[in-house]
Amino acid sequence: MKQPPLAAFFGALLAEPRKIGAIVPSGGRLARLMTSEIEPTAGKVLELGPGTGVFTAALLKRGLPARDLTLVELETRFIAPLQQRFPNVTVLQRDARELASCRAELGSQVAIVSGLPFRNMPIEVITAIVGGGFSLLERGGAFYQFTYGQSCSVPSDVLGELGLRAERLGRVRLNLPPASVFRISRIEE
């Protein structure tokens, strides 16, 4: 039996609210801003913490081929709904902290879209995820992260340690709650 994405979201939220890090799934306006710089013909894209698939749907709507999109989701409740909703997209149940060891399996990526709640994570976990993500990104690639705060949810110490910079792309006031989107890239590029 199919489980609706919202049922999966609220089940996960009730079970582990800090792990989910949101009170409702991200909205369409946020999804459009998060994916606005990713060209459909650019290459492979990795999505971390896709949840109900709002960013996934936006990427596919922009024309990204399903074969070029891989979703990494740890929460068991989201796996089957994602596979049912996006049957041609690769969905991996994996901890994003393991990205650095997945290069052979995942290959190089042109972009990473992250829905992970970094504000609820220890700094060493954020460092492992972002550092692992950049080990997969091609030169010139970017890591897109949203946050409900005004500043980037990747701490400045982590950015500095990894040789990265964060630039705010915009704020979506009509999201619940309002959210900011950041593009994280290598300093030398």
Model-flagged regions — what are they?
Residues 53-57:
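Glycine-rich SAM-binding Motif I of class I
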Residues 1-40:
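S-adenosyl-L-methionine
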Residues 82-83:
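Conserved SAM-binding loop
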Residues 75:
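Conserved SAM/SAH-binding beta-strand->alpha-helix loop
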Residues 137-148:
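Conserved beta-strand signature within the Rossmann-like core of class I S-adenosyl-L-methionine
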Residues 42-51:
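Conserved class I S-adenosyl-L-methionine
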Residues 127-139:
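A short glycine-rich, Lys/Arg-flanked "PGG" loop and its adjoining helix->strand segment in the class I
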Residues 171-189:
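Core SAM-dependent methyltransferase catalytic element
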